[in-house]
A protein has these predicted regions:
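Class I Rossmann-like S-adenosyl-L-methionine
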Residues: 1-210
Length: 210
């Protein structure tokens, strides 16, 4: 979703401009008698991390505009910092990286989403009896989504190694879910992998055998 009519949102641009001008970072930068690409880059980086990213009014605006953006803000901020830090010289032709690494990456994401959604009841059934102390309805919604995606990858993506899948979804749990979610998810997936291997339900080929 893009903001197409900036004239309707210029109050927030002016707000950030005002915050920038009032910041010590900006004032110190403007007092410098000499400059360089490295100094300019560091100024922009400091300005973003100290003035723009923490701005509560901007955060509230983005939250009101689209609620789901709130979960993405930390990831986007980290991405921006990495991109600014990576800039090396003023004459380089810098381009904003694509959403997907390549066509294969895009196809994988789309296939994972479609297969997880179409088979979610089947995947939920695999771990419903692995949580004797928990009613499935009481498991955090994000944990159930992570589990379904992991099971989908284990069973429907034969070329992806088991270890890669386990590590990937444990990291997702640590990053986005509750503090104890990674332990909970690790226990369930570990038992499921053993079960899938025992009944030969999980078939890996090629790189997936690693």
């Amino acid at each position: 979703r893009k903001i197409n009519q900036w004239i309707l949102n210029d109050d927030y641009i002016l707000l950030l401009l005002s915050a920038t001008k009032e910041s010590t970072i900006y004032q110190n930068y403007m007092e410098q008698t000499t400059t360089s690409f490295a100094a300019d880059r560091d100024f922009i980086l400091d300005l973003f991390t100290e003035v723009i990213a923490p701005n509560e009014k901007l955060y509230d605006y983005l939250e009101d505009l689209k609620l789901t953006w709130v979960d993405d803000i930390p990831v986007v901020n980290t991405f921006i910092v990495k991109q600014l830090t990576a800039l090396q010289s003023a004459d380089q032709k810098w381009k904003l990286p694509k959403v997907y690494k390549d066509q294969e990456d895009q196809e994988y994401a789309q296939e994972l989403f479609i297969k997880t959604v179409l088979n979610e009841k089947e995947f939920a059934g695999y771990f419903s009896d692995k949580t004797p102390n928990w009613d499935v309805d009481r498991i955090a919604e994000l944990d159930t989504i992570i589990l379904k995606m992991a099971i989908c990858e284990l069973l429907r993506f034969p070329s992806i190694p088991i270890k890669v899948t386990l590590n990937e979804y444990l990291e997702l749990a640590k990053e986005y879910s509750t503090p104890k979610s990674s332990i909970f998810i690790n226990g369930i997936l570990d038992n499921l992998v053993k079960e899938f291997q025992a009944n030969k339900k999980m078939q890996k080929i090629g790189r997936g055998l690693l």
